[in-house]
Structure formats: structure tokens, C-alpha cells
Curated annotation (Swiss-Prot):
One of its GO terms (biological process) is potassium ion transport. Binds cyclic di-AMP (c-di-AMP), which may regulate the activity. SUPFAM superfamilies: TrkA C-terminal domain-like. This is K(+)/H(+) antiporter subunit KhtT. The transporter is composed of the integral membrane protein KhtU and the regulatory protein KhtT. The gene is khtT. The keyword Membrane applies. GO terms for molecular function: monoatomic cation transmembrane transporter activity. Residues 76-161 form the RCK C-terminal domain. Its main location: membrane. It is found in: Cell membrane. Required for activity of the potassium/proton antiporter KhtU. Involved in protection of the cell from methylglyoxal, a toxic by-product of glycolysis. It is a peripheral membrane protein. The lineage of its organism: Bacteria, Bacillati, Bacillota, Bacilli, Bacillales. Pfam families: TrkA_C.
Length: 165
């Protein structure tokens, strides 16, 4: 699958997606939380086949279904309450970040920040699920992180953003 990400200043982000079977869609995530999904004709990319608009809550529920979670509204609500402080965040390693060229073991994010690195999506789209301590972080890698928001923010500031330099 090929995904192109573009900033839309004043609007949000646009993701252009082409699946392995060459089907194309565009997802726009607005700064206010709304999502729009557009599905295009594979033979004529200018022909819109369908579109749908979702609010933030609807998009998250659909993401849970697509992500393979068993969808039961009552169970989902109790999970959200039990893990209200636990979040999963995707963060692209910025130019100049202190983590570039270092291994996960060197950073010891679990011990030092109480954060778990679930996956690393390398800049060439290679996916490392449950990466080991010897996994090297490179500029433009996307890290999938799990932890409390305050711990994630500190890790991102200290090692993943260009701000920590």
C-alpha cells in the first residue's frame, strides 16, 4: 500500500492512499476533528465514486472496527474509561532530533519515559513491529508509541522532535 501525506494549511492533513490492488482513496483530517473519505474510479482518477464525512468520534469507532477490535459499544466505553490516560500516538522523527542514529536500547524509552514503542515505520515504508533494543531510529521514521500523554510529550520533546536539540 502506498500512502502520501500532505499538509493542508488552515485545514489539516490529506492522505492519498493506493492499495495493493490499485484502488485509490483520499482521506482529509480537518483540524477540528472531522474526517472526509473520498473514493475514486481506478480507471479515471478524476471521477469521484463516493464520499463520506465523519466526526471525530465516528472516525475513531470505525478505526477500531477496521483495526480488528471487537466492536461492542458498551465494552469500548469501559475500555476508554479504564485507559483514559493511555494513548497511542504516531510521531515522525524530525530533522535534528537527538534520537537519530541511536538505538531504542540506548534511549531506553520504557524505563526512562514509561513509554512503549509498538512499531517503527521506516522512511522507506518498511515496518518493524515490536522493534527490539537494537532497532536504529532514523530521520523521518514514524514511531508508534503507547503511554500516558504527559510521558509521550516529554519523550517527543527530548528525543524525537527537532526542539530537543
Amino acid at each position: 500500500m502506498n500512502i502520501k501525506e500532505n499538509d493542508l494549511p488552515g485545514i489539516g492533513k490529506k492522505f492519498e492512499i493506493e492499495t495493493r490492488s490499485h484502488e485509490k482513496m483520499t482521506i482529509i483530517i480537518h483540524d477540528d476533528g472531522r474526517r472526509e473519505i473520498y473514493r475514486f474510479n481506478d480507471r479515471d482518477p478524476d471521477e469521484l465514486l463516493s464520499n463520506i464525512s465523519l466526526d471525530d468520534s465516528e472516525a475513531r469507532q470505525i478505526a477500531a472496527i477496521l483495526g480488528g477490535m471487537v466492536y461492542k459499544p458498551q465494552a469500548l466505553e469501559s475500555i476508554e474509561m479504564a485507559f483514559s490516560d493511555l494513548i497511542i500516538e504516531w510521531f515522525k522523527v524530525e530533522k535534528g532530533a537527538k534520537s537519530i542514529g541511536r538505538t531504542l536500547g540506548e534511549l531506553d524509552v520504557r524505563q526512562n519515559y514509561d513509554v512503549t514503542v509498538i512499531a517503527i515505520i521506516k522512511h522507506n515504508q518498511e515496518k518493524l513491529l515490536n522493534p527490539g533494543a537494537d532497532s536504529i531510529i532514523e530521520e523521518n521514521d514514524t514511531l508508534v508509541l503507547s503511554g500516558e500523554r504527559k510521558h509521550l510529550k516529554k519523550l517527543i520533546h527530548d528525543f524525537l522532535s527537532g526542539e530537543g536539540v
